[in-house]
Amino acid sequence: MLDCIDINYEHLKSVASIHSTSYPEDHVSGSMTQQLIVDYYTEFLSGENFFYGCVSDSLNRELLGFVVFGKGLPDRVTKFKRNNRLSLIIFFLSHLNIFYRLIFKRLVASFQRKDNFEEAENLILSIAVKKGASGVGPFLMDAIDKCYKKNEVSKLGLYVACSNVRALNFYYKNGFKVKAFVSGQYYMEKEYE
C-alpha cells in the first residue's frame, strides 16, 4: 500500500536520484550534478508550496516518487538560479552540448508564436517516479487533487515539453487541458469544482 509523506532535507538525496533517472537528458536538470539537484529542491522545502513523497508503506520508507506543487514556484526557481549562478555556469561549461541545445531552443522559441494566457496561481513544478515503481504517478496526482479540493483551489497549471508525450498523456488522463504554447512547452490547466 502506498503512503504519502512530507519531504524534508533528509530525503533530498533520494529525490535527486529519482529526478536524475526520470528526467530526459534534453531537459537541463536531467543532466545536472546530484548536489545541484539537491540545492534546487532545497528551495521548495518551505513557503507556500507542497513537497510530497510516496513510499511503499509506513514501515518501508524507501522513496518511490515525489511531487512539488503550490504557489510562488517561479520565484523560487529564479532564486535558485541567482544563488547558484557560478555552479550553473561551471555546469554549462562542462556540458557544452546541453548549453548549445538550450541556446538553440531559446533562439527557436524567440521566433515562435507565443499564446497569451493567464497562468494559474498554483502550479506543479515536478512529478517524478522511480523507475519500475507502479501506480506512483496517479497516487501523487490524487494527493494533489485531495489537497486542492480541501483547500478550495479552483485551478492548477503546469508546463510540459511538447516532446514529452508520456507526460502529456498522463496529464490528459488526469483532467488537464492545453491552454497555451510557450517556448516549446504546452501550458496545461486543470479546473477544480
Task: Outline where the language-model segments fall.
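Conserved GNAT acetyl-CoA-binding A-motif
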Residues: 118-123, 141, 148-161
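Conserved beta-hairpin
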Residues: 49-67, 83
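A short beta-loop-alpha structural element at the N-terminal edge
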Residues: 1-17, 71
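Conserved acyl-donor/pantetheine-binding loop and adjacent beta-alpha core of acyl/acetyltransferases
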Residues: 74-121
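Conserved beta-strand-loop-alpha-helix junction that forms the acyl-donor binding cleft
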Residues: 117, 125-132, 158-168, 184-191
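Conserved beta-strand in the GNAT
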Residues: 61-71, 123, 128
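Conserved acetyl-CoA-binding loop-helix of GNAT-fold acetyltransferases
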Residues: 129, 133-147, 169, 173
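A short helix-loop-beta-strand connector motif used in the catalytic cores of GNAT acetyltransferases and
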Residues: 40-53, 71-79, 123
